[in-house]
């Protein structure tokens, strides 16, 4: 396979009905269809060989089981993370260990197809156990917001660390002002899309959480603390924000309604 050969991949979408800030989030309507349907359409547009929604809720399953090209994996209700849910989905789907699985969040109705393909291609050609995407931080609010995860990476593009803190910490600039992004350096925010082989997904789900994951509440740190590589590429086009709150939902509805 040459470096220009597009990756063959499947997309798995974890979808939970319960949401503290936006109950029933996957079924909230954006335009004429539920949010989860928009997400499956983005995955199909990206060229995924298979698209699966992993859920433990019959209402979500009923909303999408009729969609062409979309499969439903009814998973257990006790999963503590989306990774655990996707590991069960992979077993239900019967994917072999080498299958490239893209983990696309169920609240990303506007995820660009190019970005979905990019993370699959990155896994294919990087040799890392996982791949993910990042985007430049262009404002101080995001840089200092703990809900916006930042990352640093090696010169070769592998993740060095993910944090809710602003990393790298610009000692001189931040000592005097924190209302802008320093001109010197590169600040990246993490985009929560992942690719991994189905076999590594099972290994990941079986690992116990590490100290760093528990402190930062960032699941990907489990992989790094265990010594595995995560390749990171800057997204080829912007990822619009996901839907987390009622205000986010209103903005998404306005976006779809706009001519």
Curated annotation (Swiss-Prot):
Belongs to the KdsB family. Activates KDO (a required 8-carbon sugar) for incorporation into bacterial lipopolysaccharide in Gram-negative bacteria. Its main location: cytoplasm. Keywords: Cytoplasm, Lipopolysaccharide biosynthesis, Nucleotidyltransferase, Transferase. InterPro entries: Cytidylyl_trans, KdsB, Nucleotide-diphossugar_trans. GO terms for cellular component: cytosol. It catalyses: 3-deoxy-alpha-D-manno-oct-2-ulosonate + CTP = CMP-3-deoxy-beta-D-manno-octulosonate + diphosphate. The lineage of its organism: Bacteria, Pseudomonadati, Pseudomonadota, Gammaproteobacteria, Lysobacterales. It holds the Pfam family CTP_transf_3. It comes from the Bacteria. Its EC number is 2.7.7.38. Pathway: Nucleotide-sugar biosynthesis; CMP-3-deoxy-D-manno-octulosonate biosynthesis; CMP-3-deoxy-D-manno-octulosonate from 3-deoxy-D-manno-octulosonate and CTP: step 1/1; Bacterial outer membrane biogenesis; lipopolysaccharide biosynthesis. GO terms for molecular function: 3-deoxy-manno-octulosonate cytidylyltransferase activity. This is 3-deoxy-manno-octulosonate cytidylyltransferase. It is found in: Cytoplasm.
């Amino acid at each position: 396979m040459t470096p220009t050969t597009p990756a063959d991949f499947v997309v798995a979408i974890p979808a939970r009905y319960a949401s503290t800030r936006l109950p029933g989030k996957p079924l909230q309507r954006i335009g004429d269809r539920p949010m989860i349907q928009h997400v499956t359409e983005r995955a199909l547009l990206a060229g995924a060989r298979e698209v699966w929604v992993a859920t433990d809720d019959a209402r979500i399953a009923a909303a999408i089981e009729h969609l062409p090209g979309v499969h439903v994996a009814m998973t257990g209700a006790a999963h503590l993370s989306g990774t655990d849910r996707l590991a069960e989905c992979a077993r239900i789907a019967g994917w072999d260990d080498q299958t490239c699985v893209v983990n696309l969040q169920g609240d990303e109705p506007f995820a660009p197809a190019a970005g979905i393909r990019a993370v699959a291609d990155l896994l294919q050609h990087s040799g890392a156990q996982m791949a993910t995407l990042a985007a430049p931080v262009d404002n101080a609010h995001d840089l200092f917001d703990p809900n916006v995860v930042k990352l640093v990476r090696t010169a070769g593009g592998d993740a060095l660390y993910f944090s809710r803190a602003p990393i790298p910490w610009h000692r001189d600039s931040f000592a005097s002002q924190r209302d802008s992004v320093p001109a010197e350096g590169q600040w990246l925010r993490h985009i929560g899309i992942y690719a991994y082989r189905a076999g590594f997904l099972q290994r990941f789900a079986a690992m116990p959480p590490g100290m760093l994951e528990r402190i930062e509440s960032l699941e990907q740190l489990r992989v790094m603390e265990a010594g595995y590589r995560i390749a990171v590429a800057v997204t080829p086009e912007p990822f619009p924000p996901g839907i987390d709150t009622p205000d986010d939902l209103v903005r998404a509805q306005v976006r779809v309604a706009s001519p």
